[in-house]
């Protein structure tokens, strides 16, 4: 049955309108979670996924993070073959095995950490980045092992390590195995320290739980992106526990910098050059 509009609008116009509407690619626009402006995705990507309206740093994938940070040439992924196992046969409302399969399909990653050897403005480095979209960037056995293998490359080649954290903490589905990764990664970083090899921890939004209580806060330099949420327990959990309203901006990177918990805050478009200059000083390779 035709509508009253069909009588007034020629069929050729209606068909052209439908064709035009269907030709707009999906995912061409993205809404800023802070200012709520609708942003053109290609322009947003050119701006390193930072909102041009309010300068909010949007969350990015692990590979996007490493692509922004490392030089384009000479990259080599570390421990890419490692895959997680459901050794405990864990099941809550869903089997852990199924959660892993869903996360792998959604992200294209085998687990929540990507490690790469590459260069920063020509300086050899190893960089690792958490994939928050993979089970909240939670740390399990494979995340811990990839981190340690990245540390081993740094020890072998005597090059710096940079870690971009974005995690909800330890992976509950791996229970004690997950908690062991806190000690494992911390022990690996102690080996770097003993050898005098620099480790810079970059905290991005968000960093919580066992990751914030271990590798994220153990850098020779602890830095963060603007407005990143960083802590151990989340603000809602704390408010429910202490039954008090938290201060404005509590657990944001600016608040932590003011209280001395961070060394500096670096904008995304300044990250490469700022960290290159710092690592040049720490490795005595100032041009």
Swiss-Prot record:
Compartments, record wording: Cytoplasm
Broad EC category: transferase
Pfam families linked: Carboxyl_trans, Zn_ribbon_ACC
GO cellular component, as recorded: acetate CoA-transferase complex
Cofactor binding mode and count: Binds 1 zinc ion per subunit.
Residues of the CoA carboxyltransferase N-terminal domain: 28-287
Catalyzed chemical reaction(s): N(6)-carboxybiotinyl-L-lysyl-[protein] + acetyl-CoA = N(6)-biotinyl-L-lysyl-[protein] + malonyl-CoA
Gene3D superfamilies cross-referenced by the UniProt entry: 2-enoyl-CoA Hydratase, Chain A, domain 1
Positions contributing to Zn(2+) binding: 32, 35, 51, 54
GO molecular function: acetyl-CoA carboxylase activity; ATP binding; carboxyl- or carbamoyltransferase activity; zinc ion binding
InterPro entries, per database record: AcCoA_carboxyl_beta, Acetyl_CoA_COase_Trfase_b_su, ClpP/crotonase-like_dom_sf, COA_CT_N, Znf-ACC
EC number per UniProt: 2.1.3.15
Record keyword S-adenosyl-L-methionine present: no
Pathways per UniProt: Lipid metabolism; malonyl-CoA biosynthesis; malonyl-CoA from acetyl-CoA: step 1/1
Keyword Transferase assigned: yes
Chief location category: cytoplasm
NCBIfam families: accD
Known role: Component of the acetyl coenzyme A carboxylase (ACC) complex. Biotin carboxylase (BC) catalyzes the carboxylation of biotin on its carrier protein (BCCP) and then the CO(2) group is transferred by the transcarboxylase to acetyl-CoA to form malonyl-CoA.
Family: Belongs to the AccD/PCCB family.
Assembly and binders: Acetyl-CoA carboxylase is a heterohexamer composed of biotin carboxyl carrier protein (AccB), biotin carboxylase (AccC) and two subunits each of ACCase subunit alpha (AccA) and ACCase subunit beta (AccD).
Protein name according to UniProt: Acetyl-coenzyme A carboxylase carboxyl transferase subunit beta
């Amino acid at each position: 049955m035709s509508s009253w509009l069909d009588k007034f609008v020629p069929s050729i116009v209606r068909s052209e309108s439908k064709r035009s509407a269907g030709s707009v690619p999906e995912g061409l626009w993205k809404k800023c979670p802070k200012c709520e402006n609708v942003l053109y995705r290609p322009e947003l990507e050119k701006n390193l996924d930072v909102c041009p309206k309010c300068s909010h740093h949007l969350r990015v994938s692990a590979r996007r993070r490493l692509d922004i940070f490392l030089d384009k040439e000479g990259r080599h992924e570390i421990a890419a073959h490692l895959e997680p196992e459901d050794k405990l046969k864990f099941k809550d409302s869903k089997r852990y095995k199924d959660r892993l399969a869903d996360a792998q399909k959604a992200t294209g990653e085998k687990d929540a950490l990507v490690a790469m050897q590459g260069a920063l403005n020509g300086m050899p480095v190893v960089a690792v980045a958490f994939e928050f979209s993979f089970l909240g960037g939670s740390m399990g056995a494979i995340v811990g092992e990839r981190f340690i293998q990245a540390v081993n490359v740094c020890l072998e080649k005597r090059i710096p390590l940079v870690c971009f954290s974005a995690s909800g903490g330890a992976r509950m589905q791996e229970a004690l195995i997950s908690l062991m990764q806190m000690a494992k990664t911390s022990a690996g970083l102690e080996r770097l320290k003993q050898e005098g090899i620099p480790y810079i921890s970059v905290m991005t939004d968000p960093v919580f739980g066992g990751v914030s209580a271990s590798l994220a806060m153990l850098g020779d330099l602890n830095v963060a992106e603007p407005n990143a949420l960083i802590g151990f327990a989340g603000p809602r959990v704390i408010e429910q526990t202490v039954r008090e309203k938290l201060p404005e901006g509590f657990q944001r990177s600016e608040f932590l910098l003011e209280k001395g918990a961070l060394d500096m805050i670096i904008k995304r478009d300044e990250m490469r050059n700022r960290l290159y200059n710092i690592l040049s000083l720490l490795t005595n390779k100032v041009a």
